[in-house]
Amino acid sequence: MRTSQYLLSTLKETPADAEVISHQLMLRAGMIRKLASGLYTWLPTGLRVLKKVENIVREEMNNAGAIEVSMPVVQPADLWQESGRWEQYGPELLRFVDRGERPFVLGPTHEEVITDLVRNELSSYKQLPLNFFQIQTKFRDEVRPRFGVMRSREFLMKDAYSFHTSQESLQETYDAMYAAYSRIFSRMGLDFRAVQADTGSIGGNASHEFQVLAQSGEDDIVFSDVSDYAANIELAEAIAPQTPRAAATQEMTLIDTPNAKTIAELVEQFNLPIEKTVKTLLVKAVKDSKSPLVALLVRGDHELNEVKAEKLPNVASPLTFATEEEIRAVINAGPGSLGPVNMPVPVIIDRSVAAMSDFAAGANIDGKHYFGINWDRDVATPIVADIRNVVAGDPSPDGQGTLLIKRGIEVGHIFQLGTKYSEALKASVQGEDGRNQILTMGCYGIGVTRVVAAAIEQNFDERGIVWPDAIAPFQVAILPMNMHKSFRVQELAEKLYSELRAQGIEVLMDDRKERPGVMFADMELIGIPHTIVIGDRNLDNDDIEYKYRRSGEKSLIKTGDIVDYLVKAIKG
């Protein structure tokens, strides 16, 4: 490709509304342009990267035995009503009616459509297992699209769905997809972790997320410094303290704390160690409970894990925090003065709280706290559960090493769905025993557009993008200095351009009448891995300058050797 016949569209300045580096660089490198909130046009440079990601995904899906299909973006509402998600899904589901007043949705995912296809096409266990995939546009009406294509409303996704007559068969495909995903992200040159995850709104049993490590990531991922243990922070178990609870050394005392409505204020005003404080959070209880609320207690320096809390049997799902009005109606005190002593609602405490002695907590009286509280002396030990987020330095749940926490960008997610959708849509086949058998499902997704942004978040410097070779828009940039004034520079540039293309190498030759500084800046901004610079001065010695984008190293290569040098560097 020649720049004179190409839409380069680079920008010198960073657009003001671009918050994260991937959004900034995708705009500056001329990869995308915003059409409306959460909607982007992919320009040629961006589309080349997107297609490379898509091709790697497709190759590995095919290698893993998945079968490609293509399903409509527009889906009839009756399928969503049949599955029960018409009511469950929030405003992210874009609903509309056609000219015949028939309701439809723009698909955010395709479980209903593929299950409907399978229930109509398959009839016998002999046809299974099958794993279908597509690379298709999705639409989710995000309330606040942000970070460019990282959290857009329209995006490209690879979604796959497998169907089985046994858990063993599902596990086999799940393991194959886990391995395929690991190959996909390894081939793309990404630093990633596969982590245990919560199944979320899609539902089901086992689940793993594939997270690209990046400072701008929205997720906290947890992994051991010794073993292979890795989990999303929502799921990571906080091990109970191994040391026994210390004996009481203080009497419980009621203290006036009129200006301490938060843990931070309590610690500052009374010079307390934060690990000797407890915070109490009130949430809604399940329907038909004797009490409308449940009290959840975590240590002052810990955070409540809302996913764990929501799974407690007496806590309503979705987790809903009580309002101040609801709290006062039951406790007769405000949120800043709550604690376990004389608490009139059921109490659940975190494992770390159960190991505390001589601690401070609200007295359930406005402006007052108890100091020196001890379990079983001042208040009975309530139900104990793991309800907090782990913190760096906690012991790893597998007993090997301690935990590290890093930020991650979720680029893939695999689920064992079980029979959630097949039961709702009555997708069954005749089993080996001749009886009707409901199918067991797996679900496997990759955010194709998100992968592009995640790769940039991991691969950039002060000059622009530093693409991994496998997904770079071009492999080689040819920069002929003053080619419009030097016949030998132009002649050699054209010769190398043809020879490299004949070797199957993707080349961008900058044949614009631009200053060298502009040419260098543009090629570094868009992140082409290998650059050759052809100039009269080096040609006097039969040399060409080669520069590797990732390291910035430069070297002089003889003109007769440069093609072989590049082929070896790219293809190995």
Swiss-Prot record:
Range of residues in the leader sequence: none
Entry keywords, A to Z: Aminoacyl-tRNA synthetase, ATP-binding, Cytoplasm, Ligase, Nucleotide-binding, Protein biosynthesis
UniProt cross-references to InterPro entries, sorted A to Z: aa-tRNA-synt_IIb, aa-tRNA-synth_II, aa-tRNA-synth_II/BPL/LPL, Anticodon-bd, Anticodon-bd_dom_sf, Pro-tRNA-ligase_IIa, Pro-tRNA-synth_IIa_bac-type, Pro-tRNA-Synthase_IIa_type1
Alphabetical list of CDD domains matching this protein: ProRS-INS, ProRS_anticodon_short, ProRS_core_prok
GO MF, one annotated term: proline-tRNA ligase activity
Record's GO cellular component terms: cytosol
Catalytic reactions of this protein: tRNA(Pro) + L-proline + ATP = L-prolyl-tRNA(Pro) + AMP + diphosphate
Subcellular location: Cytoplasm
Transmembrane segments: none
Protein's GO biological process: prolyl-tRNA aminoacylation
Similarity section: Belongs to the class-II aminoacyl-tRNA synthetase family. ProS type 1 subfamily.
Function: Catalyzes the attachment of proline to tRNA(Pro) in a two-step reaction: proline is first activated by ATP to form Pro-AMP and then transferred to the acceptor end of tRNA(Pro). As ProRS can inadvertently accommodate and process non-cognate amino acids such as alanine and cysteine, to avoid such errors it has two additional distinct editing activities against alanine. One activity is designated as 'pretransfer' editing and involves the tRNA(Pro)-independent hydrolysis of activated Ala-AMP.
Protein name: Proline--tRNA ligase
